[in-house]
Amino acid sequence: MTHQDQLHRYLFEDYAVRGELVSLQETYRQVLGQHNYPPAVKTLLGELLVATSLLTATLKFTSEITVQLQGDGPLRLAVINGDDRQNMRGLACINGDIADDATLAQMVGNGYLVITLTPAEGERYQGVVGLEGPRLADCLENYFLQSEQLPTRLFIRTGEYQGEVAAAGLLLQVLPGQDAHADDFDHLAQLTATVKGDELFALPANDVLYRLYHQDNVTVYPAQSVQFLCTCSRQRCADALMTLGEQELHDMLEQDGEVDMHCDFCGSHYRFDADAIADLQQQAAQGYSPQA
């Protein structure tokens, strides 16, 4: 069967608990792109991608979420950015050797998990928690406990399906303002923990959910597509260039004959020669914003 990158929300009718399931392959492949990341970093980016998708699905308004790991280890930064429409992009910055089987702590060192919520309207919110668990899922569960005080469990799997990278996961969370019995939540978490990566990668979401919860009353909502989408553009690059001084632009052109701006998220190049720079400067002087 053809794999589709999708997220499903579901609700346990007899408990005050909601769930989400996401399975990703093409989006994951595009995030990795042409980067030659070590295996451990590829795995971690897959986990971050799944986590970001699951977190954006909890939002009730138009916004973006950025989930990033940063520290003093050889993996300086790993970040995934997503929005409520399930558009995803991400990258990693490496400064040192990383073993194929490196743990989260070995990669990041002394570091933090930073989650930034940027709503279309209103103030930006940023939460920071230490890396107090051996897995990314542990750190995220700790974030929810500290920031939202909502019992939350994440179950993330990465691997391969039909020869391509694959990542998937589930989220369980007590509904805000509701009192779910701890025993009920633990029961659902124990069931969910039995899921295997191969099941999540290969089976339709309804089949996975039936296997896990066939004795419970579960409502599954329509799927939402997940896709890689980079927000870079020629216009954004042009606007950035116009923040530079005239001498700095002159020096860049004199050295290379053009300004080549590269997007690390998607690999796109935006090139501006001397004539293009002159046009931008003239437009800026006239108060005109360049178009993509």
Swiss-Prot record:
Keyword Phosphoprotein: no
Function summary: Redox regulated molecular chaperone. Protects both thermally unfolding and oxidatively damaged proteins from irreversible aggregation. Plays an important role in the bacterial defense system toward oxidative stress.
Name listed for the protein in its UniProt record: 33 kDa chaperonin
UniProt GO cellular component terms: cytoplasm
Disulfide bonds: 230-232, 263-266
Modified how: Under oxidizing conditions two disulfide bonds are formed involving the reactive cysteines. Under reducing conditions zinc is bound to the reactive cysteines and the protein is inactive.
Localization of this protein: Cytoplasm
Sequence similarity: Belongs to the HSP33 family.
Superkingdom classification of source: Bacteria
Pfam families membership: HSP33
A Gene Ontology biological process term: protein refolding
